Amino acid sequence: MGGTPQKLYFGYGSNLWLDQMSHRCPSSPHLGLGRLKGHKWFINSRGYANIARSPSPSPSRSEAEEVWGLVYQLTPEDEATLDINEGVPYAYEKREITVEFWEKGTGVVGGDGDKDKKRGEEREMLVYIDFERDKGGFKPREEYIVRMNRGIDDALKEGVPKRYVDEVLRGYIPAEEQSMEVQKLAEKQAGGFRDESGVVPTRVTAEAVGSGVDLLKVGGGGGGGGVKGIRGVLDGRE
């Protein structure tokens, strides 16, 4: 059958938050779970999640030498919007990488860490990586903590091992609520991201919106119906 080609996208940061992805990329459904071996997860100098190859993987696999994420089927239109949200090419670059994939609902991966009950299928996926700021050890931005915690909640429900969350993600992301002011900023960022690190030129977003990729419509960042679901989650109403 013909049709527009679609990619598999591996999200490992705040795009673990299903509601955020549904507003940023409304035509790109969540398909399942992914594991990227031989890589490490960290917060870089921008204050956001990044991954890099593990320098010397140990013979016995550890949580710190693999990255877990959620997998989405990405349309070309949503990919263009995601590029803007990810600050391509200034903040992140795009790569096609082999990721182990479990289809949603298979129930082969759980919080007990029994990840090898059934091997996943190896698939090529789109991954966003910051190759310039490739070191960890930095604090996450406060609003990013909010979005990551929502993503962690969804990731655990979808089968990301709790041990990975505890040993890797929780090393950077505290399980705590932020102030209402910070939560409101997180709400805006979830609807349509605006870089606060100074890495992405301000004009890039303006040019992209002018070319027809309207973040306010796609993400609901203007305070309309598109962001309602996100606001409800942050306020605890939904």
Task: Describe each model-derived feature in a short phrase.
Residues G2-E238:
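Glycine-aromatic micro-motifs
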